[in-house]
């Protein structure tokens, strides 16, 4: 298995380009938090979640701002993390199908493991052996020697992995004991499968759950296992007896997260019902409701700085992470004020968290405006914002306003083809460009708010401009005057202008913008920040990864062709004119109605009375004046109609077809002379 090694898949697989519109520093979790790890030696908490970012926080309560740093390299949800090597190394598993190895103290990614073929959902760690296991939706379990992973370098970048086979369904949970002698997996198969990681031998299959197994814990010696399931139960298994020895019905809904004390006598559980219980494994009737969260619980992490544990950290589908005290739990038990019937409401031990790591808002709704450049979004705090896809930035925070009203307010009778797609999975705007439609949208420079140095109004391709901006730091895209002598360069505007500057000559995207090259279907090939494409390593990886359709526009400057639209032009029934032979015409879909009116005036109406309207003085007029005269006369004398609706001369053909024609077949336009 090659770590950080990418084969040149760009030529064989369909590759898309994505980028994320965001702030340079995303200080707060922007979505649900899937994973937690506590480093008691440094008083640090690692959170990893659905916004793709791993963050490091100080758990020192005296610090006003707990944020320390972000660890960014993943491109999709981070589903699990484990701290290894006494807190020096962090391993992460993600829905981008990779496992990453991080320097936890310095916060940088050391290597990437690409063995999995689908979402990686769970990790397990054997502390005494420095062994990590990873598993996911591809039904595979891989074993990794952490010391080997941390020794990987650019020249020594291969690592051997063992795999455990036999799972028939997607794996959602994984556990390994500290000694590294037992590994257990839980899946949608509803069974627990058990192996010996030393020999990769299958040991047993444990049946009992009736739904997905979402959480697993193993006793240090590997003799007992705890499982939490979407069926709402917690089960205690004896691996020696190969059977379930106790079932705990504590929760009203699915159990998604478990923690256990070092003595393996008390289990802490949370899940869909938002409640966190502590249950005595020896006396199942004794369970204490510790607290109730505001959202379903995804992960918990015990503070093991003392015995019994003084606190528990809790992550949910919301972005805030809470620390709840456990200090009164023994008095609570001793008083007998515990729940022995989970159907009866009881008072939780804690009503307020001891410490809060505040989260940020997640974008949950978006609307692409008609200009196919701007987007309106609404977040979990009901704040509405206005974004520019082309410049990859937020234009304005609109606050708590009515989302639908803002959409109506910004509606324009203009049609631009779709040229990108939007994904909100991480809680931020991720824009994806695909070869099939990236170059579909042409607009005039004037309509896009750009001015040309020569005062002209060239046609611009939005997808082409954006790709040039995203890769403007990549030296391969830079053109020098010497290159221009050898190659005739077509600018994105279609002009033959000298292009010595980087980018597209109109705008730049923020240099911190993450750019992602990935296979259609989600597998990431390469992620980098826009500004880093000038680096030697990054430039080399771009050479291997950037697909030909992007090379064509950014390196070779080959512009896509204009979109053509076929249409028919006929006299209106009210004009009394003879119907013409039905010729099928074709023009750029951006052609304005006024240009068709000029064509009608000059080539059709004027032909009948050309001898009367042409004079010697007119013949002597400069060509430009003639054109201006025709434009004015056409607008004064001609009307163009579609579906019996008089058309605005400023409208273009694609807008007419989309908003007025609205039917299959070729567009049909009718003309008539205005009544005087």
From Swiss-Prot:
- The domain of life for this entry's organism is Eukaryota
Q: Where are the WD repeats?
A: 28-67, 73-112, 115-154, 166-205, 208-247, 250-289, 292-334, 358-397
Protein location = Nucleus; Cytoplasm; Lysosome; Late endosome
Q: Which UniProt keywords apply?
A: Acetylation, Cytoplasm, DNA damage, DNA repair, DNA-binding, Endosome, Lysosome, Nucleus, Phosphoprotein, Repeat, Ubl conjugation pathway, WD repeat
SMART domains attached to this UniProt entry: WD40
Gene3D superfamilies from the xrefs?
YVTN repeat-like/Quinoprotein amine dehydrogenase
GO MF assignments: deubiquitinase activator activity; DNA binding; double-stranded DNA binding; single-stranded DNA binding
Q: Which family does it belong to?
A: Belongs to the WD repeat WDR48 family.
Which purpose does this protein serve, as stated in its record?
A: Regulator of deubiquitinating complexes, which acts as a strong activator of USP1, USP12 and USP46. Enhances the USP1-mediated deubiquitination of FANCD2; USP1 being almost inactive by itself. Activates deubiquitination by increasing the catalytic turnover without increasing the affinity of deubiquitinating enzymes for the substrate. Also activates deubiquitinating activity of complexes containing USP12. Docks at the distal end of the USP12 fingers domain and induces a cascade of structural changes leading to the activation of the enzyme.
Q: State the PANTHER family in the record.
A: WD REPEAT-CONTAINING PROTEIN 48
Domain annotation text? The WD repeats are required for the interaction with deubiquitinating enzymes USP1, USP12 and USP46.
**Protein name per the record:** WD repeat-containing protein 48
> Origin organism of this chain?
Mus musculus
